[in-house]
Amino acid sequence: MVTRDRAENRDGPKMLKPLVEKRRRDRINRSLEELRLLLLERTRDQNLRNPKLEKAEILEFAVGYLRERSRVEPPGVPRSPVQDAEALASCYLSGFRECLLRLAAFAHDASPAARAQLFSALHGYLRPKPPRPKPVDPRPPAPRPSLDPAAPALGPALHQRPPVHQGHPSPRCAWSPSLCSPRAGDSGAPAPLTGLLPPPPPPHRQDGAPKAPLPPPPAFWRPWP
């Protein structure tokens, strides 16, 4: 009984070893593939475009790139904001590639039902979202002045004069029609109101002008010579 248990315990690690080895090789291959893509982005070397490049060659490219960067940028030198932004973008791209590689490995080993469910969820997440509607103000809008051209305008009406009634004559013209009506033969200008105006004052004598002689007094009849 004890011998059988020991035999089963010995066979357990032997059965798990191929699976662990396979996972370890998959991790190495994914890391090397990511390293190849990063080196291709940085160096633009056409040899790195080959997806079946030898692992040793990928490692040699990585060592040469790091050695060259250490010569250009010695350690301890502060980096500029542009370099920090490039480093952040590179980290983001590398993380995105790592996620894609893990997703591809999971989809390859998953069942068809799980793969279909995963792709459906990804498709719904990556689908463009419709724009959100703007919030509606519950308060009613304020009334605006009418812009209808047929509506009466208020501006010109303020400058119009009140109409003059022509039915009854004015009291001034009631007793003297000749003062209000123009004379015959005139050029259309109204006659001056001579009956209502006071007589013009005598002309003032200018200083220094000679005085006019006074007329002689009238003769009176006397009984004596």
From Swiss-Prot:
Protein name in the entry: Transcription factor HES-7
Segments of skewed composition (Pro residues): 212-225
Protein species of origin: Homo sapiens
One of the protein's GO biological processes: Notch signaling pathway
Record SUPFAM superfamilies: HLH, helix-loop-helix DNA-binding domain
Compartments (UniProt record): Nucleus
Cross-referenced InterPro entries: bHLH_dom (IPR011598), HES-7_bHLH-O (IPR032644), HES_HEY (IPR050370), HLH_DNA-bd_sf (IPR036638), Orange_dom (IPR003650)
Cited function: Transcriptional repressor. Represses transcription from both N box- and E box-containing promoters. May with HES1, cooperatively regulate somite formation in the presomitic mesoderm (PSM). May function as a segmentation clock, which is essential for coordinated somite segmentation.
Assigned keywords, A-Z: Developmental protein, Disease variant, DNA-binding, Dwarfism, Nucleus, Repressor, Transcription, Transcription regulation
Coiled-coil ranges from the UniProt annotation: none
Domain notes: Has a particular type of basic domain which includes a helix-interrupting proline.
Any GO CC annotation of this UniProt entry: chromatin
